[in-house]
Each structure stands twice: as structure tokens, then as C-alpha cells.
Amino acid sequence: MMPRIVSSAALCAIAVLVAACASAPPSRFYTLSRTATPGAAPATFSVVVGPVAIPAVVDLPQIVVSTGPNQVTLEEYNRWASPLANNISRVVAENLVDLLGTHRVSLFQQSIPVDGDFRVAIEVQTFDSAPGDAATLNAVWVVRRARDGKSDTGRTTVREATADKSYEALAAAHSRAVYRMSQDIAGAVRALSRATP
């Protein structure tokens, strides 16, 4: 009698687990995207983007939603398709290709070391997500000229409204915020390319 009770309990537990898995919504994955359009005057210099540092609280696969001044929610079914720091550096590099008119833009994380005429380092201090409201980015960045170490440090603070309450609209708003930062960085690169030692 005891084995039959145990096996019935096990079957019930398995049935509950299967039902829970079957009812869970599918995960959705998002990326940031390039926003710039070609058209900048061509440049011949090269740029290396990275490293990019982000706050530990958002350095997660889940999209982290700000729900109050001291509270966040992890969106289990709405996730970034790749690590957020890599996502940001990739999109900044793609934007700089268009904004600077050069294809000689590479990522610091590449396995093959690349020496660029300029190095861009970014420290993201705020990366807030509020679906149906806005995406907020606050970042400090440094552009350093390789030949003499001359540098320019700047800060980009931007709040981009979302088009609707969807996470796709949130990712698009974050992409626009990263584009605004890319514009600031491109301006600093161009200024340093013209500056005398």
C-alpha cells in the first residue's frame, strides 16, 4: 500500500510541475539598436570602444524595472539578449561608424587586440527602465587620443520617453538614449582629432 501512495504523490507532484511550466509565458528577448544614419564627412582615424562599466543592479539578463526610489523589479520574462555592457558598447560602436564616417571602429572586448587612434571608455551610472514612461541614461565617458594621451571627459544625461507600455518601446527608448551619448562622444572625438598636442 505504501509504494502506491508514494507513487501517487510523485505523479501528482510531476503533474503540478508540468502544469506550472505549461502555463508560464514565453520569455521575450530584446537588444539595443543602432540609431545613427550615414552621412557624416568621412574620417580616416580609428576608434576603439570600451571598456563599458554598468551598475551591478542592472548587470543581469532580466530587464530591471524601477518601481520606486529604492525598489526595482526583475522582469523574468523580458530579458536582454546579450550582456547589457556588451550591448551598449556594440551600439555605441555602430553609431560612431555613422556619426564619424569611418568603418575603423572596433570593440575593446575583441579577442584580437586593436590599437586605435582614439579610445572611448564609458561608465554608466544610471540605466533606469520604466515601461510606459521613460528610459533614463546617465553616463560619464572619456575619449583619449593614443598618440599623446590628450583626453576629453564628458557626461551624458538623457531621459527618453517610451512610445507605449511595451518592452519593445522601452528598448527603443534606451537605444535613442545611447544614440544621444554616441553623438556627444563623436563630438569629442572630432574635437580631439583637430586639437593640437
Task: Report the location of each language-model feature.
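Mid-chain, structured segments of secreted extracytoplasmic proteins
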Residues: L74-R104
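A structural "domain/chain start" motif
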Residues: C21-A85, L192-P197
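Surface-exposed short loop/turn segments
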Residues: A22-A43, L99-R147, T162
